[in-house]
């Protein structure tokens, strides 16, 4: 049986060693399954693979039934923010380190991907985050995130003081190195290493995690994602806000960072029988060494 997906876009971690040969191998495999293959424009330019049509994110959104991301979670985050608005489903083939959201190993991708192309898959939808920086009543920066929005102190400065509001209600003033607002997807990233809990992807919530707080009673808290979280810069030098650790806004005193749930979702496709708990067990090495 041929693929149910006619037009497939390939997006690669082109900086990685061996990425060109991996992408060529996958493209040939997709062609043998009856797919018409296009390469994302930066991937094509940086790998020298010129034998396939090239598309930007908007072109992928308009012309492709499926996007195949070959790389690590960072590669997925970068293209995911651009593709979510188009509703194109995404499959991740891992060539990175951890691979929470690029969960198909390259070494056995053909056996895993072939049934998925025939329609045998699990779909997993994740809400995006929409953020903006407001200065003197005017929006000076906008960004979308899949994992997290992080407010950080400057590299050579002391702690920042942050005023936190949820749905217009004052929560607390926090003195810390920073603060993370993470989605369920991002709860296994920076937020986890800062001591936050893991949120199951089905939970319509965020986790608010302080980074090295001055007060030990300042603990992570789980919030609904249906409202608005606002972080105001009260004190501290050279603060910044990052979005999935890939775009950055420089902040001034009085700036307010507003975070809401986006109207867009990422559509992840996983192999049939996929389980979030299988992913946690594998990636976090649970049960290893247990008799």
Swiss-Prot record:
GO terms for biological process: NAD metabolic process; NADP biosynthetic process. The keyword Transferase applies. The active site is at residue 73. One of its GO terms (cellular component) is cytoplasm. Keywords: ATP-binding, Cytoplasm, Kinase, NAD, NADP, Nucleotide-binding, Transferase. It holds the Pfam family NAD_kinase_C. Gene3D superfamilies: Probable inorganic polyphosphate/atp-NAD kinase, domain 1, Probable inorganic polyphosphate/atp-NAD kinase, domain 2. It catalyses: NAD(+) + ATP = ADP + NADP(+) + H(+). InterPro entries: ATP-NAD_kinase_N, ATP-NAD_kinase_PpnK-typ_C, NAD/diacylglycerol_kinase_sf, NADK. The keyword ATP-binding applies. Disulfide bonds: none annotated. It is found in: Cytoplasm. SUPFAM superfamilies: NAD kinase/diacylglycerol kinase-like (SSF111331). Its EC number is 2.7.1.23. Belongs to the NAD kinase family. HAMAP family: NAD_kinase (MF_00361). NCBIfam families: PRK02155.1. Involved in the regulation of the intracellular balance of NAD and NADP, and is a key enzyme in the biosynthesis of NADP. Catalyzes specifically the phosphorylation on 2'-hydroxyl of the adenosine moiety of NAD to yield NADP. This is NAD kinase. It comes from Polaromonas naphthalenivorans (strain CJ2).
